[in-house]
Amino acid sequence: MRKFGLLILFFSLFFASCQRQETMQELTDRVFERAAAQLALLDYNLDSAALAVPEQAIYPRSTNQDGSLWTSHYKWWGSGFYPGSLWYVYEYTGDVKFKNMALKYQVGLEPLKFRTDHHDIGFQLMCSYGNHFRLTGDTISRSVLIDGARSLATRFDPEVGCTRSWDFGKWTFPVIIDNMMNLELLLKAAELSNDRNLKNVALAHARTTMKNHFREDNSCFHLVDYDPQTGAVLKKQTHQGYADDSAWARGQA
C-alpha cells in the first residue's frame, strides 16, 4: 500500500512538471488585462462619486469599510498615482480610452506646478504629466514639469544640502528618504530646460542623503532632521515606521 502511494505521488509530480508553464509575456498580458478592467471600473465609480460631491476634485485613495470609495483632493500626496496607472495601461495596450481617462484626471493636477509648501509634487507630476510627456512629447506637459521642478527647488537649503520634506511637525528641517523619488522631476526638468541649478539641487540632495540617511549595514532611516543654520544633523528617527532604529521599507525600496 505504501509503495502504491509513493507511485501515485511520483506520477502526480511527473505530470505536474510536464504541464506547460505560463510565459512571462502571457503573465504580463493577463495582469494588464486585469488592471485595465479594474481601472476602467474605478473610472466609472469615480464619476459617480464626483456627481455626489461635485465641488471636490476626486482622486482614488482607498475604500471605506462599507465598500464605498475613499477619495481625496488633488493636493493629497498620492493624487498622481491613478492617472499614472492609466498612462501605463495606455502604453501597454494602445487603447485610446485609457489615454483619455488619464488626461481627464491629470488636468486637475496642474495647479500643483506652483506649490512650494511640500515636496511630493515630484512624483505627483512625474506619474501624470511626466508619463504624458514621455509618451507624447506634449508641450504643455513639458512646461508643467519645468514649472513644478522650479517650485520644488525653492525648498532646497544650500547649507543643509537637501530639499525640505515637510513644513509641519516639531522638526527644524526634516528630510525623509522618500524625498529621493522627487529628484526625477528635478533631473528631467533640468534636461528639458537646460537649467543647471535644478540638476545641482538634485545631485546635492542625493549626496547628502547618501551621507546621512544610511547606516553601516545599508539600511536607512526614515527621517533626518537638520539644523538649517549649520547643516548639522540634529536627529535620525522614524515618523511612520516601527522604531527609530528600524529600516523604512518604502524608502529602502
Residue ranges and their predicted role:
Residues 21-253:
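Glycan-recognition and catalytic cores of secretory/periplasmic carbohydrate-active enzymes
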Residues 1-26:
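Bacterial Sec-dependent N-terminal signal peptides
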